[in-house]
Structures are given as structure tokens and as C-alpha cells.
From Swiss-Prot:
Mg(2+) binds at residues 172, 192. The keyword Iron does not apply. InterPro entries: G_OBG, GTP-bd, GTP-bd_Obg/CgtA, GTP-bd_prot_GTP1/OBG_C_sf, GTP1-OBG_CS, GTP1_OBG_dom, GTP1_OBG_dom_sf, OBG_GTPase. Residues 159-330 form the OBG-type G domain. Monomer. This is GTPase Obg.
């Protein structure tokens, strides 16, 4: 089962509510309001941890919620901010909105931080609403709900070299021979179901990371077999080593195998087919491979590919191939990086509000209006009057009347219903 794709739910902490407090002290006969503000809710933050290389942890835990802010207190005391919930993810994690498929973040660099769900603002205490005409208001704001969304995480292995080829071409054997990685090795398709990383040490401080990309089959770019999952891992490698079964032990021709995999890479992402590629002609310990080598080498070298005969069984021919791969890595020119950000924050666009009539009731919808509803103290007449006054200032009442609403019509905002009235509140 793949662990390079995960679907999780994240929610920022709700803001703490404000306080409804009155100052009562000796020698302060007209103390007035003294309620403090609530604290902001904690954020849900992704941090890139270079020590991770899978999304397996998200297989067992899928719901993440940051701490809410503390409520405001008397004497103008401000509630404490909720703790941020920090979630570690491996380098190469792509964060998408599960509903829209929009890419929110592409997390590659160690220590990179991204806020995926912001905490809600703390509600204001009653001292914030004092005016010359209302010197001691009796209401406060509730805390703003934290942002919540479902995310789709995709992991693209970050490696210098990717091994591609048909199942059973000998990639896992090659990787275990040139590094300390120990992939599962057996004679059947899809032996490797997740990428296996290894470090190749050439000495003198020269090393690189190599990844055994799970085996490909014809039609992989259309999702045949486990194609999309496999191809996703290839995209960030700098160099490809195409491992061929030179002996054709599965009854296939090595040159035909090369063309099939090359075409799958090109169909999935044309840039992959143009990536620097070396050909490892494997299983040279078998007579059929030695017989096929001249024909395959001539055909591929005419197309610009360097062919290296190797044997996973005897470990012959590895050094020249690895040296050539290292040289290509050094020649690789990284894309121009974007200006670094200490912390990236996803801020969804506010879409305003809309009005429509359904079942004889006028409905008002919109993130801004929903936030106002959630933070209003509905059990308090002063707070309700403030809510209606804000709707009027935002032009909602005028828009309702222009749409055909009349006095006495029912207006519904979220779960709250009221009658449209001509007289100002």
C-alpha cells in the first residue's frame, strides 16, 4: 500500500471569547466596562523535516486541530493565544486543497514552514464597544472559528538519481549493491511498492542520493497498474538511470523495454523524457545479455544515450556508471528559486456575499457574513442590534430591497432568521 498520498483534515484553533465585565472598585463610582479580549486560536503549521521520507504517519492519524485561544478576563485581561499545532512533513510534500485540487504549497527545503489553517481571531471584550452614547455595553464578541479544510498531501521523493525500468529489471539489486539501502528483492512484478532511498558514497567527499522508483509498466501514465503513484516519484530527480534486463529473462526485448518506459515518462510529463539519462544494461553475467549488448548499445548510442554494461549478481561495471551519474549531477542547473519566505500562509480569497430567495425566504451567504454571525452574542439585544447595523452599513439591506425584498419578509443568515424592517435599529 502506498504512503506517498494522504488525505487529512486540519482546523485552526477557535478564538477565545471576549469578557463581559464591569469595573467595580472603591473610589471608582462609575467604573465602566472592563472586559478583556479573547486570545487568538493556534495555527496548524507544516514544517519540513529532512529526517522523514514517507507520509506513513498520516495513515494512522488524519484529524489535526490546533488549540483554541483562552477567553478574555476581567480587568481588561487578554486571553492567551492558543498553541500552534506543528506537523512535520518530509521534503518534497505537495499540499493541495482536497475540494478544488489547487496546489497550496510545495514544501522542499528543510525547515520550510507553511500555515495550512489559521486560528480564529479572539473576540473583543465589552470595553471595546463603549461609545459616548453607550458607556457601559453589556455584550462581547465570541471568538472567530478557526479555518478548517481537508488537504491532499502528495510526496515526491527528493533524490539526485532515480532508477527507472520494468519490474524485475534489477533496480533493487543494483541499489542494495551500491548503497546501504536494503529494499525487498524477489522475482515478481511490483516488488518495490514504495520508493527506497540510498546514499552512494564515491569517496573524497563525493556522494549522492539514489532512489529505487517502483517498477513501471505500459500504460502507467494512464494509471494502469500503479502508474500514477510510481511516476509521481520521478519528477524531482536530477538524473535518471534506466535499468534494462539485458538478458530479456521475462521474454521481452531490452530495446523494446526502453522505448515503453521512455514513452510512459514522456506521456506523463514531457520534461521527464528530456532529463539526463544513463542506461544500465543489467544481467551481463547471463549469455543472452552479452549477445544483446552490441545491438542495443548501437541503437541507443545513436539516440544520444550512454550505455553501461553491469551485473547485479557479480557487481561488475558499477563504478563507471556511478561516476558518470555524479558528473551529470554536478552539471545540473537548479531552477531559479523564488524569494525565500520565513513562513508561508495560505489565505483563501474572500468572495464577498450573495443574496437569493428560496422557499419564500431570503438567504444571505458569504464568508464575511458567516464570520460575523459566529462572533455575535445572540442572547444579547445590544449585540443583535449591532449585527443588524453592520449589515446595513455593508449594504446588505439595500441589496435585499433592490432584489425585491419587502418589509416583513423573512431573511436567513446561516441559522439565524429575522424580519426585514424599515425603521433603523
Amino acid at each position: 500500500m502506498f504512503v506517498d498520498v494522504a488525505r487529512i483534515y486540519v482546523k485552526g484553533g477557535d478564538g477565545g471569547r471576549g469578557s463581559n465585565s464591569v469595573r467595580r472598585e472603591k473610589y471608582v463610582p462609575q467604573g465602566g466596562p472592563w472586559g478583556g479580549d479573547g486570545g487568538r486560536g493556534g495555527d496548524v503549521v507544516f514544517v519540513v523535516d529532512p529526517g522523514l521520507n514517507t507520509l506513513v504517519d498520516f495513515k494512522y492519524q488524519k484529524h489535526f486541530k490546533a488549540e483554541r485561544g483562552e477567553h478574555g478576563g476581567p480587568k481588561g485581561m487578554h486571553g492567551r493565544k492558543g498553541e500552534d499545532l506543528v506537523i512535520k512533513v518530509p521534503p518534497g510534500t505537495v499540499v493541495k486543497d482536497d475540494d478544488t485540487g489547487e496546489v497550496l504549497f510545495d514544501l522542499v527545503e528543510p525547515g520550510q514552514r507553511a500555515v495550512v489553517a489559521r486560528g480564529g481571531r479572539g473576540g473583543r471584550g465589552n470595553m471595546r464597544f463603549a461609545t459616548p452614547t453607550n458607556k457601559c455595553p453589556t455584550f462581547y464578541e465570541k471568538g472567530e472559528p478557526g479555518e478548517e479544510r481537508w488537504l491532499l498531501l502528495e510526496l515526491k521523493v527528493v533524490a539526485d538519481v532515480g532508477l527507472v525500468g520494468f519490474p524485475n529489471a534489477g533496480k533493487s539489486t543494483f541499489l542494495s549493491a551500491v548503497s546501504a539501502a536494503r529494499p525487498k528483492i524477489a522475482n515478481y512484478p511490483f516488488t518495490t511498492l514504495t520508493p527506497v532511498l540510498g546514499v552512494v558514497d564515491l569517496g573524497e567527499g563525493r556522494s549522492f542520493v539514489i532512489a529505487d522508483i517502483p517498477g513501471l509498466i505500459e500504460g502507467a501514465h494512464q494509471g494502469v497498474g500503479l502508474g500514477h503513484e510510481f511516476l509521481r516519484h520521478v519528477e524531482r530527480t536530477k538524473v535518471l538511470i534506466h535499468v534494462l534486463d539485458g538478458a530479456g529473462t521475462e521474454g521481452r526485448d531490452p530495446l523494446s523495454d526502453f522505448d515503453v518506459i521512455h514513452n510512459e515518462l514522456r506521456a506523463y510529463n514531457p520534461e521527464l523524457a528530456a532529463r539526463p539519462t544513463l542506461v544500465a544494461f543489467n544481467k551481463m553475467d547471463l549469455p543472452d545479455a552479452r549477445e544483446n549488448l552490441p545491438r542495443v548499445r548501437e541503437a541507443l548510442e545513436k539516440r544520444g544515450y550512454r550505455v553501461f554494461p553491469i551485473s547485479g549478481a557479480t557487481r561488475e561495471g558499477f563504478r563507471p556508471l556511478l561516476e558518470a551519474a555524479y558528473d551529470l549531477i554536478r552539471q545540473w542547473v537548479p531552477p531559479e528559486p523564488a524569494a525565500p519566505e520565513a513562513e508561508m500562509v495560505y489565505r483563501p480569497k474572500e468572495e464577498g456575499w450573495r443574496i437569493y430567495k428560496y422557499g419564500g425566504v431570503w438567504h444571505v451567504e458569504g464568508k464575511e457574513i458567516e464570520r460575523l454571525v459566529a462572533m455575535t452574542m445572540w442572547e444579547n439585544d445590544e449585540a443583535v442590534a449591532r449585527f443588524l447595523r453592520i449589515l446595513r452599513l455593508k449594504g446588505v439591506e439595500q441589496a435585499l430591497r433592490e432584489a425585491g425584498a419587502e418589509d416583513g419578509d423573512t431573511v436567513r443568515v446561516c441559522d439565524i432568521e429575522f424580519e426585514l424592517m424599515a425603521d433603523p435599529v
